[in-house]
Amino acid sequence: MPFTLGQRWISDTESELGLGTVVAVDARTVTLLFPSTGENRLYARSDSPVTRVMFNPGDTITSHDGWQMQVEEVKEENGLLTYIGTRLDTEESGVALREVFLDSKLVFSKPQDRLFAGQIDRMDRFALRYRARKYSSEQFRMPYSGLRGQRTSLIPHQLNIAHDVGRRHAPRVLLADEVGLGKTIEAGMILHQQLLSGAAERVLIIVPETLQHQWLVEMLRRFNLRFALFDDERYAEAQHDAYNPFDTEQLVICSLDFARRSKQRLEHLCEAEWDLLVVDEAHHLVWSEDAPSREYQAIEQLAEHVPGVLLLTATPEQLGMESHFARLRLLDPNRFHDFAQFVEEQKNYRPVADAVAMLLAGNKLSNDELNMLGEMIGEQDIEPLLQAANSDSEDAQSARQELVSMLMDRHGTSRVLFRNTRNGVKGFPKRELHTIKLPLPTQYQTAIKVSGIMGARKSAEDRARDMLYPERIYQEFEGDNATWWNFDPRVEWLMGYLTSHRSQKVLVICAKAATALQLEQVLREREGIRAAVFHEGMSIIERDRAAAWFAEEDTGAQVLLCSEIGSEGRNFQFASHMVMFDLPFNPDLLEQRIGRLDRIGQAHDIQIHVPYLEKTAQSVLVRWYHEGLDAFEHTCPTGRTIYDSVYNDLINYLASPDQTEGFDDLIKNCREQHEALKAQLEQGRDRLLEIHSNGGEKAQALAESIEEQDDDTNLIAFAMNLFDIIGINQDDRGDNMIVLTPSDHMLVPDFPGLSEDGITITFDREVALAREDAQFITWEHPLIRNGLDLILSGDTGSSTISLLKNKALPVGTLLVELIYVVEAQAPKQLQLNRFLPPTPVRMLLDKNGNNLAAQVEFETFNRQLNAVNRHTGSKLVNAVQQDVHAILQLGEAQIEKSARALIDAARNEADEKLSAELSRLEALRAVNPNIRDDELTAIESNRQQIMESLDQAGWRLDALRLIVVTHQ
């Protein structure tokens, strides 16, 4: 290999060193200085892993002074090159630049430059890059993008709401599903879609203080969204880093109390430019026209500043009309400004609901009914649709569905309010109560008597709380180490129950973490029962491990012992047996406990076991919950209302459980209230709203489409290939789970999402739902998205060379495989990828420019090729460089036609869809005031910007592979 002092070469194995200069040559060795790093390398002359850097006419080069030049001519003299061309800064022509003065920091980014500079990738990396481009483009085009990656069951009504709301510009909606139907999941799905598509980047979630950790866990575990929890301490810390502490994080959770307590803090929240605000338990925001509460005013102030708002609340019937109006007023104060007018409007929706019911019943419609439908929809062109709906043809059902959609679009608050009920959603289990009455031990009787004497001055509420937990009273006098479990009959009963139901997974819930820990020790030491503990003192990772151990079928824990707070936000649908070791203080907490098992998708009826001690507050509460509210065996939407109305009486009975006079009357009174309120709620059900929120067949089809996508084997093959190339170790753990750990040879030192200890993953949704320690891998998981970014944002796999053993072709025949990318640049929030994601166009050219890509499929062709080592590859490239240049020019001439076709198709699709959506909403605006002006303005503005961006779309060469035919 001829070396001359001053020549520029690049290292094949250490390209990061930049351009090297030959500074010494002797008979056997050559020394290169790499000025950008100041390092020297000594190579053997005969077989050195370096490539001569030679630019060609048309290339742009940079001098060591920083100016650039377009090369027009290359001269060689005594082995040294001089480039002649035009300077780009001064436009001076005929400028000469000797190669010794080239910029040493040169990085070859174009695939052809990397190939000619000897920066040749492994063949499998080229294949991975092409697949990454192909799959990435396909995923952006999926109609349900953003709905597949969450660790949740595919529940149609949840998917329907998320699909509808998640695609809107700055959605402002009220989610008012009944308890247990998954409002939190719906909100998470909407957030996930908006964040993934770029429609939103900054999100604020405001919740009651007790639910902060539940939301934190739920967002992370189900949606891979890592929120920061802001409290007083975190807020104070962040003040050192930014003028507005909330600017330090993109995703924030804080409590309502934290938000409203300080005027400055609320101002900072309002100024933080959030894209989405989520408020949980919004029904607790007290409002009246004359005196709105401070909490309501705080949220109102925020809602004025934040474009998108999701309010999670109890059902409208539970709230009452005025309270319901107050929530809607937060979403759109211009639309909902007059309560009396709102009440009148609601009455007028009855005929619409009747019309929808009529269509869904499938009966033939009379002429009067057809005319009424025509008037309600108010459009001239629906006559054919009405006729089709009333015919016996195959199209009748779809015509009826379309008419139902039109009616719901035009009437009611269906664009801003979503509400599902258990009656309208299938898939809930039965709940069966088993009460176990147990004698009150003498030790407790004594402790209670002494406590009564010593605590005579305590309030009735404090005495009532004490009486719910007699073991705590006993420990107050005997010390924290007192062994109450040795004589408490509930412990004996629990051990007996567990030993006789060894094959059952049992969830045991008690109020205090200390109780859970003591029970675990007793079960382990006395009966060898495997019990996991779950309480608020544990970290999220520790809780995950406990939950995973409980979920293991054969070797896992039989029992999970949970404290009240520790179990918030966790669901254990694989178990159907629950033991309440004690009872919570109010009906909301009781429903929350049962809700750990009573979820959609629960396969078995739920067995609720309540061992209680007679003559204690537990015996009072168990009767009140069961006989007064029917709260164990059915959800109890009336519970809180009745609890508040009888609070004082109930507290007195709990504080003095031996005073039972009048208690039967209280229970009877509560039961009557419960039945009356229930009937009232049923009467007030908005059938029209339920039909819209539920989604019907459309929602079912959406769930089935995603389920089909879950079975896509392409993801598994691609992910394994990706992990191999990044350098991630994979260890099959069985049960459809894989453990990933970093290796010593990673493509990047710290791969986002992969901890030093490794992570457990699964591609199976069912496994992910049962095992909280296993991350659910989909195309939307950060691990895959980060992997795609790592490959596609750099030059991994962008240039390679392969051998094709084919005796039907002459030895030395050249083929060049080109991967172009057609793309447009636009702000992320425009979601341009819906129409034109970066799209690969593959060409396989021979030396005459014939494109063989259509005849030769990529994967089949890839399997026929053999790899070449980098050194041999560099020699081959140098030998055929001129031919490759010629083929590249033929490729450039051909790509324009293919790229233009893609861009035109994207323009037509964008124009058609966005114009249709705008026209639809403008037409609806005339009959349904729930369509906001800012939504129409945003769609029109987005349409214009998207069309402009598509007009500027272009293409570039992303990767190339040189193929040389051989017969050996």
From Swiss-Prot:
Residues 164-334 form the Helicase ATP-binding domain. A motif (DEAH box) lies at residues 280-283. Signal peptide: none annotated. ATP binds at residues 177-184. Belongs to the SNF2/RAD54 helicase family. RapA subfamily. Interacts with the RNAP. Has a higher affinity for the core RNAP than for the holoenzyme. Its ATPase activity is stimulated by binding to RNAP. NCBIfam families: PRK04914.1 (NF003426). This is RNA polymerase-associated protein RapA. It comes from Escherichia coli O139:H28 (strain E24377A / ETEC).
